[in-house]
């Protein structure tokens, strides 16, 4: 029986770089991806019959749900925001950060009361779930795509819901973390049909990737 290819979608940027380092550790390198001048869209390890491609983070769960990719590696923030029908199978332990509610110190008291406040965010689904289902606070959510930190500074919102790594950008703009929504990191996701049809191969990859997280 001829073995088909497994396809892996990687979220562009640092996560993809770290993910490929992990794949290399378990004997699945992809030298084609190291060529910075390449215009290729699909990268192949012929020996292992595995194809890789890079995609914008929010698109990775979509590729996986619809079967264009069997496996995806993407941040937990994207998984929560997109809400796709996929299996989340492994926390890779890198790309760690936090989803937080941030704003000026003066906004802290607004998070304790019943007053309707405005929340600017790139993640409306996560923000809505946090405020409505966990805090039971009514808010107006404003979806933005650019620098979220700008919103409370210019009076568009009282607080923001955004990813925080070091907090330096917040501090430089007179903002601080007021509440933590949830911790985040890179995750492995799998297409539901692929998990059944290619269970042995996918399980072997997951097991290998899991072994790379032990030293982290």
Regions found by a protein language model. Give the residues of each.
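Domain-level signature for soluble enzymes in the chorismate/prephenate branch of the shikimate pathway
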Residues: 1-216
């Amino acid at each position: 029986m001829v073995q088909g290819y497994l396809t892996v979608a990687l979220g562009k940027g640092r996560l993809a770089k770290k993910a490929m380092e992990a794949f290399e550790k378990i004997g699945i390198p992809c030298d084609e991806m190291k060529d910075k001048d390449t215009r290729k869209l699909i990268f192949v390890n012929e020996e292992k019959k595995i194809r890789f491609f890079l995609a914008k983070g929010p698109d990775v769960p979509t590729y996986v749900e619809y079967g264009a990719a069997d496996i995806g590696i993407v941040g937990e923030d994207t998984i929560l925001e997109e809400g796709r029908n996929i299996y989340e199978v492994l926390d890779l332990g890198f790309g760690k950060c936090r989803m937080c509610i941030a704003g000026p110190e003066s906004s802290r008291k607004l998070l304790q009361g019943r007053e309707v406040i405005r929340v600017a965010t790139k993640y409306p689904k996560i923000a809505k779930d946090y405020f409505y289902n966990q805090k039971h606070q009514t808010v107006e959510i404003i979806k933005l795509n650019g620098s979220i930190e700008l919103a409370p500074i210019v009076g568009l919102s009282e607080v923001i819901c955004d990813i925080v790594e070091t907090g330096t950008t917040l501090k430089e703009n007179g903002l601080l973390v007021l509440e933590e929504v949830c911790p985040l990191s890179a995750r492995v996701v799998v297409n539901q049909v692929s998990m059944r049809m290619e269970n042995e191969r996918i399980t072997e990859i997951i097991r290998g990737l899991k072994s790379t997280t032990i030293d982290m």
